[in-house]
Amino acid sequence: MSDTQNLKRRLAIVYLKEYFEANKHLPVTTNNLLDYLSFKGVFIERKTLIESIKALKVYGMDIQVEKGRKASYFYQGMKQEG
């Protein structure tokens, strides 16, 4: 993997944060997220995507998951402290 590709992969979490913030309260599928990252030049596997979403949740983003045949993610905002 080239240095540029490696850097872009590391940026995936930043791009995901931007995407969730721009689509607040809207259902977002795994394919939506992978397509957006692809548009940004970032190519990751689904497993890596799931781990990135978990990291964003730890960061404090309230991302709800609706499981089913096609999982949907809903960003509700930042979690409140307290």
Show which residues each predicted segment covers.
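Short, basic/aromatic recognition patches that contact phosphate-bearing ligands
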Residues: 1-82
